[in-house]
């Protein structure tokens, strides 16, 4: 089976395991069976807001207006195709495999614009992209609360110049204010 890995770094011949700075995972290399899921990782960022419906369908839900275009629009990447191996383990994330070992690249596909590539995958029915305008009130409230918890759990109020803190403060001001209020209340 072919597995995908996407990176903003072109020209790789071997994919190396690494530690991601914000997710608390061990040194590993992540791959997936799904092209659109891999495309989400063509950027290095703090959040990848995709998920799966109960029917197992992949979706991406914007968490603020214009999120998809801001994060992916005009950004290039390389989609790497690799062969599945016995040392690749499934994770709790559907369609994801991880390994602690380097993996040779079978093929590299340049992706000149990740947003255009994701929209093409949506057109093909491989992913549903949900714009902010279609996010219902219950999900909007969940987003505010989830980001509030993230701010508190990572103690970002104490480190306001941390890149993640600056991003969350700018994109989720209501969550930032609620976290500050919660921390300051007796």
Predicted features along the sequence, with ranges:
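ADP-ribose/NAD+-binding catalytic cleft of ART/PARP-like enzymes
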Residues: 1-29, 41-44
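Short, flexible beta-strand-to-coil junctions
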Residues: 5-12, 33, 81-86
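Conserved NAD+-utilizing ADP-ribose enzyme module
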Residues: 41-186
């Amino acid at each position: 089976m072919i597995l995908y890995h996407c990176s903003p770094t072109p020209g790789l011949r071997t994919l190396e395991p690494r530690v991601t700075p914000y997710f608390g995972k061990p040194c590993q290399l992540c791959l997936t069976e799904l092209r659109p899921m891999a495309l989400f990782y063509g950027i290095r960022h703090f959040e990848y807001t995709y998920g799966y419906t109960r029917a197992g369908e992949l979706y991406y839900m914007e968490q603020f207006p214009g999120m998809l275009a801001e994060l992916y629009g005009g950004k290039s990447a390389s989609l790497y195709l690799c062969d599945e191996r016995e040392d690749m383990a499934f994770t709790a994330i559907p369609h994801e495999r991880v390994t602690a070992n380097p993996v040779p690249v079978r093929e590299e596909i340049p992706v000149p614009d990740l947003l255009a590539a994701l929209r093409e995958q949506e057109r093909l029915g491989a992913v549903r992209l949900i714009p902010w305008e279609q996010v219902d009130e219950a999900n909007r409230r969940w987003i505010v609360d989830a980001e509030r918890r993230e701010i508190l759990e990572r103690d970002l109020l104490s480190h306001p110049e941390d890149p993640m803190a600056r991003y969350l403060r700018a994109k989720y001001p209501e969550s930032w204010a609620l976290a500050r209020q919660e921390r300051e209340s007796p």
